Amino acid sequence: MTSNWMKIVLKAQKIKYGKNLLLKGVPVIFNKKGSSIEIGDNVTIKSSFLSNLVGLYSRTIIVTRAENARILIGNGVGISGATIYARKGITIGDNTCIGGNCKILDNDFHPIEAETRNKLLSDPHGGDSDLVPAKEIHIGKDCFIGAILLF
């Protein structure tokens, strides 16, 4: 069951979510203007160390960081203390389990080349710049992603 307060937060962030969304603890969710986050039916998101005894290091974090970025979480997905951070797009298929403390990042947060990094420092858009490379991630249906993995 999702609290009324979290429903208000999701609505304010323009996040679409399906039936029976179960939030255990309070996730960090940020949906950049012009981007989208969609959560399917029967999804469970665990965000407190007591909600999964594997030893969660942090709350679940779901972020779109650039315009037109998209995160799509399918039906029946379970997430525990993971970070899902998109500049382009991340799709998680139906009935997939994301283990405790996983990091799913479609970008490296900064360019590898020093010259391009220096350009980014003077870019007025900063972290929103196209200078930060990103590639879409697609995780299929019925997958099991073990704990403490980085994509």
Each language-model region and where it sits:
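Domain-scale signature associated with acetyltransferase and cell-envelope carbohydrate enzymes
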Residues: 1-105, 111-112, 122-123, 132-142, ...
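Short glycine/proline- and charge-enriched loop/turn segments
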Residues: 117-128
